[in-house]
């Protein structure tokens, strides 16, 4: 696939896509901002602990591949990065806000059920109902320039199948899945995580505001 990424590249792009929507006042992101976003404890699976040098290497690679671009100049004391992975002026990949929300959540969290995706993507896009989630996933799975997601085989006893993005290559549909919580508990956990993410982002905004006032 034209857009095939490594796991670390997927994390970096997912973070930039997320912050572009959820904290636009802090976007584009500096190197430090990207490191912080990549290593977040909430809304990340797996949790990573990348160094500045490791993140810088990924940023440089993505700039060379034209998936990111640097932003510098008047008023910018440090180099910042913005994504050109999708919906950029000269890029080919065009996604709707709903598609961006689902792709971003899959890049950051891996395989998830439609119910989990709806809860976890709510900060980026508010789906009207589960039918909209399902139809958006179906479109991503059937796009002519894709497919970009795949529906995984449902495990025995599970109510919903999980979906996974294909930006890191084909997914082994027969691979054994990690143990999952029951559907109701899983949905509750997703809602708790969404609230934790909101609190974390509010704290991040407050810290940024206090730092700005202190300058």
Swiss-Prot record:
Origin superkingdom: Bacteria
Position of the signal peptide: none
Cross-referenced SUPFAM superfamilies: Winged helix' DNA-binding domain (SSF46785)
InterPro entries, A to Z: DUF480, WH-like_DNA-bd_sf, WH_DNA-bd_sf
Coiled-coil regions, chain positions: none
Keywords from the UniProt entry: Acetylation
Pfam families: DUF480 (PF04337)
Residue list for modification N6-acetyllysine: 80
PANTHER family reported for this sequence: UPF0502 PROTEIN YCEH
NCBIfam families: PRK11239.1
Family assignment from sequence similarity: Belongs to the UPF0502 family.
This protein's name: UPF0502 protein YceH
The organism's taxonomic lineage, starting at the top: Bacteria, Pseudomonadati, Pseudomonadota, Gammaproteobacteria, Enterobacterales
